[in-house]
């Protein structure tokens, strides 16, 4: 294969059959259970990378069901997102995500820098309760529950939240193990069609695990919960800070 052909075909690995296709990445009927809880502020400050700043001692534990996503298929995700500010702009920093599908793990890490690992999350309705779970191997590390559609949520507030910028710490090593890419990436959700959103009573339990350390941000108090369904496009990102650039 000629070098020009390699350069022309190069998008993702393997060259002849990439693990994921080029975008756009459209999601239909994407369902969220988002439980916001208060945690230890010092632990947050220890985990959130500068120049991001912790806004308040809150964490959002998200269980996300994605039955129809372009190129990525049908999968479920769970993890922790932290409200932050970036030079005065409010947004969210994705701390950790766990999912059950290889293409979005590979694509998420390589394109955007999502901190994704393989695990077994679920989101389902059990009679009158919306239930989210996260297992790492055979070990349960998170369970979230919420009363099913008890009250309609403020749609304007939900739309505003979905429109905020999102931030990721993208790290890709060089062949010698040193960091080749270490960047803060910003991305947005686009073309959002909010199908519905609801609130209700909620609970969240986290358990310690050496390789899925979600319990390192302990639940001190559940503050709120929202259940929403939306169609949206996951836009590609842009680099807003390069940790390897010389000052």
UniProtKB/Swiss-Prot annotation:
Its EC number is 4.1.1.4. It catalyses: acetoacetate + H(+) = acetone + CO2. InterPro entries: Acetoacetate_decarboxylase, Acetoacetate_decarboxylase_bac, ADC_dom_sf. It is an enzyme of class 4 (lyase). The active site is at residue 116. SUPFAM superfamilies: Acetoacetate decarboxylase-like. One of its GO terms (molecular function) is acetoacetate decarboxylase activity. Keywords: Decarboxylase, Lyase, Schiff base. HAMAP family: ADC (MF_00597). Catalyzes the conversion of acetoacetate to acetone and carbon dioxide. Belongs to the ADC family. This is Acetoacetate decarboxylase 1.
């Amino acid at each position: 294969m000629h070098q020009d052909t390699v350069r022309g075909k190069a998008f993702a690995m393997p060259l002849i059959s990439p693990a994921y296709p080029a975008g756009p990445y459209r999601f239909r009927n994407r369902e969220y259970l988002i439980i916001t809880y208060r945690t230890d502020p010092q632990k947050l400050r220890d985990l959130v990378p500068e120049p991001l700043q912790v806004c308040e001692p809150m964490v959002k534990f998200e269980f996300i069901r994605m039955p129809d996503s372009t190129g990525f298929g049908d999968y479920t995700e769970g993890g922790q997102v932290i409200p932050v500010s970036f030079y005065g702009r409010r947004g969210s920093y994705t701390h950790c995500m766990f999912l059950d599908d290889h293409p979005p793990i590979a694509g998420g890490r390589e394109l955007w820098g999502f901190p994704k690992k393989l695990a077994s999350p679920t989101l389902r309705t059990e009679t009158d309760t919306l239930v989210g779970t996260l297992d790492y191997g055979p070990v349960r590390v998170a369970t979230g529950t919420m009363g099913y559609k008890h009250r309609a949520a403020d749609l304007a507030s939900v739309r505003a939240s979905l429109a905020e910028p999102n931030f990721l710490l993208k790290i890709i090593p060089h062949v010698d193990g040193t960091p080749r890419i270490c960047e803060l990436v910003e991305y947005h959700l686009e073309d959002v069609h909010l199908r519905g959103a609801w609130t209700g009573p909620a609970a969240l339990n986290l358990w310690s695990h050496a390789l899925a350390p979600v319990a390192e941000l302990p639940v001190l108090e559940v503050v709120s919960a929202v259940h929403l369904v939306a169609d949206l496009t996951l836009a590609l990102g842009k680099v807003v800070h390069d940790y390897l650039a010389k000052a």
